[in-house]
Amino acid sequence: MADTGEPYAAARREVIKEHAAASSCGPPSGSKVLLWINGPCGAGKKTTASELHRRLPGSVVCAPGAVGLAMHRMLPPSARSSWQDIPAWRHSVLELLRLTLAGHDGPVIAPGTLVDDGHFQEIIGRLRDEGVEAHHVALPAEPATVVRRLRARSLGLEPRTQLWEVTLLDGWLEQLRRPEFATHIHTDHKTVAQVADVIAQAAGLTITPSIDGPVRAWLHRYATTIRHIRWA
């Protein structure tokens, strides 16, 4: 825990400065870049998005799940299911991404689950047709890995709000393995930093190197987990 403080901050500032000066740092000026990180709940979408955001200067995270959670809070438990099947969710996410891309010059990172090809085309396909440089990656993992992560997110409990996610897990993973949802990055045996590196390489973006030690990397993951605990 002695690596915190000014030496660490100074090192990160130097790394960011060097990469900002590099001519190969990201897409041409003026292009609109979207990174959609797909996968079932518990695959590591949000932690990966957070890692990319920290290491990709000028990026912003636009989380489609926040729209779905708001809709779920308006519905009785008996009516809750996968929000990607709700037309209002898909329309809202598309419009919010359009607004974010129009108002922000840097890459937009969107961690969200899409397992239906029609829904995929309705959001990502539409944005591509409109000229957005939309990159998509899927983060499949073994069911046992996903369930373990969901339990960790809920502090070891079996939260009622995630029961529907577990029941849909096998179907989601089967869908995401299809070639239509490439690029596939299996996360079972990769660190979050390694997954972020692969995504950046696939999208042709240069991110700052990870200089986190194991403790700091764990703290970042834990902080992201705490922020996304679902209490109701």
Say what each PLM segment does:
Residues M1-C25:
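C-terminal alpha-helical interaction appendages
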Residues T47-E95:
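Conserved substrate/cofactor phosphate-moiety recognition/catalytic segment
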Residues I37:
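Hydrophobic anchor at the beta1->P-loop junction of P-loop NTPases
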Residues G44:
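Conserved glycine(s) of the Walker
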Residues Q84-A138:
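Glycine-rich phosphate-binding loop used to anchor ATP phosphates in small-molecule kinases
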Residues P40:
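P-loop (Walker A) phosphate-binding loop of NTP-binding proteins
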Residues E130-R151, I185:
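Conserved phosphate-donor/acceptor-positioning beta-strand/loop module used by diverse small-molecule
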Residues L155-V198, L205-A232:
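Small-molecule kinase domains that catalyze NTP-dependent phosphoryl transfer to phosphate-bearing small molecules
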